[in-house]
A protein has these predicted regions:
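Membrane-helix interface motif
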Residues: 135-142
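Hydrophobic transmembrane alpha-helices
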Residues: 1-59
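Hydrophobic alpha-helical transmembrane segments
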Residues: 9-13, 57-61, 87-91, 116-120
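Conserved small/polar residues in nucleotide/adenosyl-binding loops
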Residues: 149-156
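Mid-bilayer segments of alpha-helical transmembrane spans in multi-pass integral membrane proteins
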Residues: 98, 102, 123, 127-135
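Interfacial aromatic-anchored transmembrane helix boundaries in multi-pass membrane proteins
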Residues: 22-36, 62-107, 138
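Internal alpha-helical transmembrane segments of multi-pass membrane proteins
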Residues: 110-126
Length: 161
């Protein structure tokens, strides 16, 4: 049976909704922003594995917009960032970091090993985005005395689940 575009669109919307609900289940809220959530990246990765990278990136981008809106309600604008740093934070910490989850399907035709490898690459790319954002933000505050090791530890915790 040939899959319709409408069915794929609805499935993507359901996965974004499920990922959003899971992102509200916070196991631990980190002191400098971010949190450990209950498998909130999994629905986006599953969609990307099932439908491919192109559609996965599209759904992941929609999820990034939802996460940005959630970040606004969590107090993103209360951080006291300069306008340039705020724009950098929005693009790196939200749009790029969540959109890269769509690459989880890059090895989808390789079976379970490919699914795991693609998901691990997606999570690593998300970590890189958050790490770069942390460097940019803390450098703008003049607080780069915070070591890169400490920053890596913070971002690693934020990307665990």
């Amino acid at each position: 049976m040939k899959r319709s575009k409408t069915l794929t669109l609805v499935e993507g919307a359901v996965m974004v909704a499920l990922a959003t609900v899971l992102s509200f289940i916070r196991i631990y809220k980190l002191p400098w922003g971010g949190s450990i959530t209950l498998l909130s990246m999994l629905p986006i990765a599953v969609f990307s594995i099932k439908h491919g990278v192109a559609k996965g990136l599209g759904v992941a981008f929609v999820f990034s917009l939802v996460q940005f809106i959630q970040g606004i309600t969590d107090g993103l604008f209360g951080w006291g960032l300069s306008p340039v740093m705020l724009v950098a934070c929005i693009f790196i910490d939200y749009l790029a970091a969540y959109t890269v989850l769509g690459v989880a399907g890059m090895f989808r035709k390789k079976g379970a090993v490919g699914w795991i490898a693609g998901t691990m690459i997606a999570v690593f790319l998300r970590f890189v985005c958050h790490f770069l954002s942390g460097v940019v933000i803390w450098k703008s505050f003049g607080a780069l005395s915070v070591s890169y090791t400490h920053l890596r530890a913070h971002e690693t915790l934020a990307n665990l689940v």
